[in-house]
């Protein structure tokens, strides 16, 4: 692999650093641009948890694609949360890459939030040849939060309910340990807190009288329903909550007349595999879909959606993507 370090100057004068990974120093190549998931991310798609590195999956994707004789462009993400800025940066990055002498045509690879970025951008670039969409949201924030709050969190609460009476008590949560799953997002943002003495307590919206218990049916479900109906209401719990009632990508997908490969793990603990099916259906004859048993949001091995903390993408995924590319883009 030959690596060409590049710096992109944006219209506002700010700079983005990236690299073009090439099979050889000379020649023109079909070039896959990698678009990150949500939050802070670099050209490696580094995911960290508890002070350690969980994965750098863009390194593995790039290595696999370059071996298959594709070039890869990846970059250090500048903006963490404002989707309009993220898309604007991605558009300028794509325009820059399209003009490089080594680039014959471009392909989009989006992971999670990157799926939204890809489907928003692709119509601006007539030299785009294909899209690879991994673990993306089809129907917007409401479906995203419905899966996490109504399905996965309810499943976890029932698992924690020692009395099987749909009433959760503080003692049911004493063995919970924070991790990087969507369940921890629910537990530590929406359910659990501490009092002035540092003791565990429940959110006042679930336990307004401070009795140390709440009902799944009477307390949790109404809160979940409120957030699903209007995800912007999450702002009272998290400052980086969605500031929009985004309805998803299906309208954009229906307009795309390019080969599309949809990838999703059946044990994804953040985005329901149903979303992948919706994307593939919207693309009609343009799409192929691969659903991977036992893999999670990062297409790494995961035993359950409730335990999806991310991890190293499986080699099988890269092999399947390369096979699809050889068949549909060559």
PLM region descriptions:
Residues 25-28, 32-64:
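Short, surface-exposed "cap/lid" segments of acyl-processing enzymes
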Residues 295-299, 303-330:
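Catalytic active-site module of serine/aspartate enzymes centered on a nucleophile-bearing elbow/loop
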Residues 96-151:
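Primarily recognizes the serine-hydrolase "nucleophile elbow" in alpha/beta-hydrolase
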Residues 1-27:
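N-terminal cap/lid segment of alpha/beta-hydrolase-fold proteins
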Residues 57, 81-99:
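Alpha/beta-hydrolase active-site loop
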Residues 258, 271-281:
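Short alpha-helix in the alpha/beta-hydrolase fold that links the catalytic acid
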